[in-house]
């Protein structure tokens, strides 16, 4: 079965095609609007691999947490394609995908995505044979919240993601217990989405199309501004 993976949770979007046996192709694009990047990158990937869209048997979508506009574009694109192609869809956590990409370590894994406003989206994972499992649930907060969680766990840690790179000085407060993953792992990859979604699609444990929504973990700037105006009007 060919599965199409889509991730638009950060400033770098990626599209991938893969099967149970191999990755057929992947393209990552940074610095362009997600609306333009997803459509053009998908066309480019299909042309490059010589695969017709109609051969896709399932879709893996990065559902966040991540950037609001990017997540909305990726999730809606994936859902639309799944509806048109009449294929199953699976939502994959962007943090799960980050941790999955460095699963070969024996250390705990701290996956961290830049949430802007001086905050991170983060979760901590433990490597197990064939993958990772969560030690903590996804959360949003300033870097010291993640540092506090890691201090409490008291283990050596591999920190991965653009959030870990951005706040590496704060993470270094833990001394020699924290190693920073290579910049190549700074963003969730669509290929990891495919790997994580494939077993669920094969077992028919896919998501209900209309129940699949982005995981934001906090309100958007527009929602915060609206709340502030509403409170001001009521005072």
Model-assigned labels for residue ranges:
Residues 22, 30-33, 88-188, 202, ...:
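Surface "functional belts" at beta-alpha junctions
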Residues 47-54, 82-92:
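Phosphate-handling active-site elements
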Residues 60-89:
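DPxDG-like acidic metal-binding loop motif
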């Amino acid at each position: 079965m060919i599965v199409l993976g889509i991730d638009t949770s950060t400033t770098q979007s990626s599209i991938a095609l893969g099967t149970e046996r191999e990755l057929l192709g992947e393209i990552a694009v940074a610095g362009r609007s997600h609306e333009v990047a997803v459509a053009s990158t998908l066309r480019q990937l299909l042309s490059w691999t010589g695969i017709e869209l109609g051969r896709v048997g399932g879709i893996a979508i990065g559902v966040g947490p991540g950037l609001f506009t990017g997540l909305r574009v990726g999730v809606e694109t994936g859902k639309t394609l799944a509806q048109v192609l009449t294929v199953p869809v699976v939502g994959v956590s962007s943090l799960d995908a980050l941790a999955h990409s460095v699963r070969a370590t024996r250390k705990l894994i701290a996956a961290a995505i830049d949430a802007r406003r001086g905050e991170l989206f983060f979760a901590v994972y433990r490597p197990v044979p064939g993958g990772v499992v969560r030690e903590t649930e996804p959360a949003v907060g300033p870097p010291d919240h993640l540092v506090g969680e890691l201090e409490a766990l008291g283990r050596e840690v591999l920190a991965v993601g653009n959030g870990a790179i951005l706040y590496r000085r704060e993470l270094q407060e833990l001394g020699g217990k924290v190693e920073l993953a290579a910049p190549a792992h700074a963003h969730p990859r669509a290929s990891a989405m495919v790997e994580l979604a494939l077993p669920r699609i094969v077992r028919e444990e896919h998501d209900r199309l209309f129940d699949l929504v982005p995981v934001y973990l906090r309100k958007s700037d527009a929602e915060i501004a609206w709340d502030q105006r509403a409170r001001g009007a009521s005072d």
